[in-house]
Amino acid sequence: MNLTHLDEKNHPKMVDVSQKNITQREACASGKIYMSKEAFEAIITNTAKKGPVLQTAITAAIMGAKQTSNLIPMCHPLMISKVQTHIEENKEECSFKLFVTVKCEGKTGVEMESLTAVSIGLLTIYDMIKAIDKSMQITDIVLESKEGGKSGKYLRS
């Protein structure tokens, strides 16, 4: 297997994308956070002491997408043109599922930006509600879809 982030001496390197074409890139990732009923109720009734949890998580997810190249060593800085979030609440499971779609025109994809955004958004929920429930679980952070670039479309089955 040829790993593009390693040189011939197995040293890490940032991939040279200068010869790649600029194309539309889009990726969507998702993840879930499970919590106690008390924590879930505090979020949906907007009574958490740290403020509006879901709105803050959305803002954090957007910031996370924009900061990806500062957090993941081999990621290129990108001119992101769109970050869109969607949160599904599941009362029976006491969980929230966060979806983040990131879009840009560039020479490299935005998969890492969408995955980072989901991670930061869910971590923000954890941070804001941990006084009520320290046993929350963040799970199932996955790439749902991507399109653009040489590898084409991907859709999680």
From Swiss-Prot:
GO terms for molecular function: cyclic pyranopterin monophosphate synthase activity; GTP 3',8'-cyclase activity. It holds the Pfam family MoaC. SUPFAM superfamilies: Molybdenum cofactor biosynthesis protein C, MoaC (SSF55040). Keywords: Lyase, Molybdenum cofactor biosynthesis. Its EC number is 4.6.1.17. Belongs to the MoaC family. NCBIfam families: moaC, PRK09364.1. This is Cyclic pyranopterin monophosphate synthase. It comes from Campylobacter lari (strain RM2100 / D67 / ATCC BAA-1060).
